[in-house]
Swiss-Prot record:
Annotated Gene Ontology cellular component terms: cytoplasm; excinuclease repair complex
Primary localisation category: cytoplasm
Quaternary data: Interacts with UvrB in an incision complex.
Functional note: The UvrABC repair system catalyzes the recognition and processing of DNA lesions. UvrC both incises the 5' and 3' sides of the lesion. The N-terminal half is responsible for the 3' incision and the C-terminal half is responsible for the 5' incision.
SUPFAM superfamilies xref list: C-terminal UvrC-binding domain of UvrB (SSF46600), GIY-YIG endonuclease (SSF82771), RuvA domain 2-like (SSF47781)
Protein name: UvrABC system protein C
Domain GIY-YIG: 41-120
Record bears the keyword DNA repair: yes
UVR domain mapped to chain residues: 230-265
Family membership noted in the UniProt record: Belongs to the UvrC family.
Top-level taxon of the source organism: Bacteria
Any Pfam family the entry gives: UvrC_RNaseH
Organism: Prochlorococcus marinus subsp. pastoris (strain CCMP1986 / NIES-2087 / MED4)
Amino acid sequence: MINPSTKVSTKVLDKKYNFKIEYKLIKNKDLLKSRLSEIPKSSGCYLFKDIDNNLLYIGKSKTLRNRVSSYFNNYAELSPRLSLMVRQITEIEIIVTDSEYEALNLESNLIKTNKPYFNILLKDDKKYPYLCITWSEQYPRIFITRKRRNRNNFDRYYGPYVDVGLLRKTLFIIKKIFPLRQRPRPVYKDRTCLNYSIGRCPGVCQEIISSEDYKKTMKQVSMIFQGRNDDLEVFLERKMNQYSNDLEFENAAKIRDQISGLKLLTESQKISIPDSSINRDIFGIVSENNISSIQIFQMRSGKLIGRIGYTQKIDNSDETEILQRVLEEHYINVEGVEIPSEILLQFNLPKHNTIEEWLSELRQKKVKLIIPKRNKKFETVEMVLKNAKLELERILNGIQDNESSIEDLTQILELTNQPRRIEGYDISHIQGTDPVASQVVFIDGIPSKQNYRKYKIKDPNIFIGHSDDFASIYEVIYRRFKKWSKFKIDGGDISSLQDKKKSTLENDLLTDWPDLIMIDGGKGQLNAALKALTQLDLHEEVNICSLAKKNEEIFIPGFSKSLDTDQNQKGLLLLRRVRDEAHRFALSFHRNKRSARMNRSQLSQIPGLGPSRIKDLLEHFNSIDAIRIASREELSKVKGLGMHSANDIYNYFNEL
């Protein structure tokens, strides 16, 4: 349900058009033409939805019909990301506004409220880290993360920051200045840990501090990442003086130490420029080879308090459009108090005046977009552009290395097409115990962790004391490729999967298809995988190889001996990275599974505890150690566990 907080009039919102269909628009040209002709040529917002009524994308335009039509008329020229989106559209919703400014304001509120998947222009490529504060939790945590997707709507992300070292240092100092929650879970169930004793934590685990008071402290911390150090210092000084007037000298001393730490933090921000009374953000964009590097320098009171970086594929857009979209998306995710009075740019934006009006509305004060031509402001923009250029060069060098590795691997394996998506598989167990498998994915030579998968081996012939790597590999490959075998049996053309941009297939069939799969092992493991593909009638369509650990030998179907390769060849090094990552991921999963089994095994020795109660216990306490130190009363609170069973568990661990 879309319920944005917006100043658009009711009259405007009543002008709403809803085009609902039962299948994808891109597959029905006549219906698509009819629907597009019904879209008005006025300004407003458009909302793309899929067959399950999920919001895919929210956009705005001065001329709605032209903008929406461009997605379908120029489909072949769209980026892979947008073409994937267009293939899923089954419904278009239109909201007409009276002006372009109202459309921008409405779009901002709709995106902030609904967070559609394809609206993340500044996609989470994990190049730069974010600072997260989990406001959705009773006692919010603060931590550094490289993952922004699937976040709770109440949580707040700052960044992404280019200088991860400075970010870690800042967070380290903050945790020394302010008593904050240090751990995601408590160490002990019934007492505080050392962090409370030394004043690093206010006793969150035992709720010694109330949630309301703790959130007040976290609110002060958030001001630092909003660039409001001066405001925070003034607030703390007033608080310190109040404590002094009330003769609460111990509390006043704590605030004094916080002020000293805050000043130390401010002084550590090395770069400074004149005009210290002005707060400003400086945007710069540099592009080459269809990739743009965008840098944002956040200057507050003359100090550089934040350096934010993004990379973006150009996708037939010019730099002015990209920079405007980056600016919009950046300020959609901040509070009004975080927007500075000046924003320096290298050129005018396509909707320069509209953006300026929108930002002023968000800030509730005048915001100026300035394109300096000379003096210190111009030099500051040049400094940002220089940093953006250096970052772009670093990115392009990395891309070039990956491209040469992929090209070399193509030649080594004599592939028809370059392996853009490589999947690596490995098995992990101890003498048949807890057998698992991993599937890792590298796209363009870079790990794509959101596409990793774990497999629990189901073969009943694999058990403690009886391992079978070949049978395990066979099972995993068979399970992985079974859906494509069904697609082929139903008359589907597997070759159409190669052109992922132009295909109109369902996205799970399309985007998952690997250009190459690599098995960790030798000829035996390769043959096991090949056996599964042969039974699925996919052995001719799937490119496959294996990489043996002993001599880093590559095996391919049809050859009894390994390929003749140089140990330092870039293609081989890429395969080794895939193999090592598959091994790491499988081993990690195996250890977790083994640990969970051992916990269950220990609990199963307690009379009266079956699998269901053991599961409830572990879900309630998170670990066997927490169960071990729990009191009878705490144990009895577990769902379905009475005092009698609680006594049995307590006596078991305390040897009574």
